[in-house]
Amino acid sequence: MTLDLAHYPLLALADTPEQLRELPQDKLKQVAKELRQYLLTSVSQSSGHFASGLGTVELTVALHYVYNTPFDRLIWDVGHQAYPHKILTGRRDRMPTIRQKNGLHPFPWPNESEYDTFAVGHSSTSISAAVGMAVAAEKEALGRKVVAVIGDGAMTAGMAFEALNHGGDIDKDMLVILNDNEMSISENVGALNSHLARLLTGNFFNSIRDGGKKLLSSVPPIKEFASRAEEHIKGMVVPGTIFEELGFNYIGPIDGHDVNGVVDTLKNMRNIKGAQILHVVTKKGKGYELAEKDPIKFHAVPKFNPSADGLPKAAPSDPTFSNIFGRWLCDMAQQDPNLMAVTPAMREGSGMVEFSQKFPAQYFDVAIAEQHAVTFAAGLAKEGQNAVVAIYSTFLQRAYDQLIHDVALQNLPVLFAIDRAGLVGADGPTHQGAFDIPFLRCIPNMVIMTPADENECRQMLYTGHKLNKPAAVRYPRGSGTGVKPDNTMQALEIGKSRTIRQGEKVAILNFGVLLPYAEKAAEVLNATVIDMRFVKPLDTEAVANVAKNHELLITLEDGATTGGAGGAVAEYLLSTVHTSRLLQIGLPDEFIMQGTQTEMYAEIGMDDAGIIAKAHTFLAQ
């Protein structure tokens, strides 16, 4: 699919930032208009992240117009809002392939484009990277500028403030753009603030300020008075005290959809030395009424008709594992008033909307603060509350010390409901849930469960909730296998597996939701199939039994094989006298790119065909 550029005459002239900078400034408003329409049309025909990019169109145009990218470094936080950036940096015609196998990466990716200066996908990393690049730029002494763009949501994370604290302290030349698209920091936007922003960034104001500081540096009382006067003038309309205290010169807020106003402000700010923050207010979903009204719903979209009155209704399907978790959470809360559910800003994705509405006193969204989420849950558990942390596998990585030091070390009964375990599909390598089993398995006191279907997931959540120690239940993105969960809940016997099929010579030890692949492969291989259920404690009795009676053991898991569940089986076999051969099948020692789960499991050789082929090859050796 290629869009007809005849409908985008100015955008057609700006395939790269170099071409964009050749246009007169009075054409930028039209460029932004065409860019927004191009984004709307392309994403509606291909799917992808949507509302965030609509809100950053003018800002993106202004940044590439003012700064000499890619020589000047532009770092996008997370990357949801970077679709306009991709369109303006030579990837316009490939936008229909975004998030698809062998297509454009879903987030900024340096291997894809020199304009993507830093790989991102998780939030709140941009300022830290920018501080490092600013130090390097000063050392190079080539006049390189460094700009980080971060949203107000990402600014809630501790890492962002750690970077601000350091960046303000060393005061290197850098600009942080706070893209405030939720009005959560300030609504104080208007002509006066836009005028003030241009005034405060202009040469006249800054020459007076810098010159005055030098002149009065030997007269401390007068210098202090002048500083207070400046702060008073700015403070009347500028809500930037916290940033000023951290050592950044704060400008704004300004209207992020006034492309010429943003350009003028950025041109002025290029000439200011030291650490700067520009507060830009934008509207998520800007220019598409439905997305403006419901930016959460339109954050990421399937293919849709822009002329329709909403997104297409999803075809009937089995409940997702997130749905299973959400239903269990509500059912459990009806029985347990001490259940406390915690999420780091992933209410919708984790299936917690209904719970948050029905049990608001037991629901805690701590914002993008994974470290705090885990230790907060530890505090709840220490005082007798039954804490449940709902978190994506890839984001649990960010709270590893808290997992060990604050939960496991004290053997606190915190249940981790780990969503998006295994391959997540279109979001690619930054979001694959590959590493949770390896990094959890080495932690003392931790119980790790891998449900094979919806009912096991529900029963394991109940088991972990009733267990008086740390526990984790990991489950994938998307729909289950069609197994209807039992309404009743029953605790499983810890560390015990179940036999699915009895065969000969080959035994498949399955951990998790790849069980249907294992069963199909077993029909061809005449293999025994064991649903292992628990990675830790491992059912060593079951492993020992199949090792006695089978020539080949195959471990199958939707996570990294290095240190994974297969590794646990290998370690046990090495510690005994069993001589069975072992084939570990799982995610290889590499970062897996984007594509559908089905596509990627087939490519890696983790589907039934791959299992059969690997087994035959292994047996032939």
Swiss-Prot record:
Transmembrane segments: none annotated. InterPro entries: Dxylulose-5-P_synthase (IPR005477), THDP-binding (IPR029061), Transketo_C/PFOR_II (IPR009014), Transketolase-like_Pyr-bd (IPR005475), Transketolase_BS (IPR020826), Transketolase_C (IPR033248), Transketolase_CS (IPR049557). The keyword Hydrolase does not apply. Thiamine diphosphate binds at residues 80, 121-123, 153-154, 181, 288, 370. Mg(2+) binds at residues 152, 181. Keywords: Isoprene biosynthesis, Magnesium, Metal-binding, Thiamine biosynthesis, Thiamine pyrophosphate, Transferase. Its EC number is 2.2.1.7. GO terms for molecular function: 1-deoxy-D-xylulose-5-phosphate synthase activity; magnesium ion binding; thiamine pyrophosphate binding. Binds 1 Mg(2+) ion per subunit. Binds 1 thiamine pyrophosphate per subunit. One of its GO terms (cellular component) is cytosol. Its cofactor is Mg(2+); thiamine diphosphate. It catalyses: D-glyceraldehyde 3-phosphate + pyruvate + H(+) = 1-deoxy-D-xylulose 5-phosphate + CO2. One of its GO terms (biological process) is terpenoid biosynthetic process. Pathway: Metabolic intermediate biosynthesis; 1-deoxy-D-xylulose 5-phosphate biosynthesis; 1-deoxy-D-xylulose 5-phosphate from D-glyceraldehyde 3-phosphate and pyruvate: step 1/1. Homodimer. Catalyzes the acyloin condensation reaction between C atoms 2 and 3 of pyruvate and glyceraldehyde 3-phosphate to yield 1-deoxy-D-xylulose-5-phosphate (DXP). Belongs to the transketolase family. DXPS subfamily. This is 1-deoxy-D-xylulose-5-phosphate synthase. The lineage of its organism: Bacteria, Pseudomonadati, Pseudomonadota, Gammaproteobacteria, Alteromonadales. The gene is dxs.
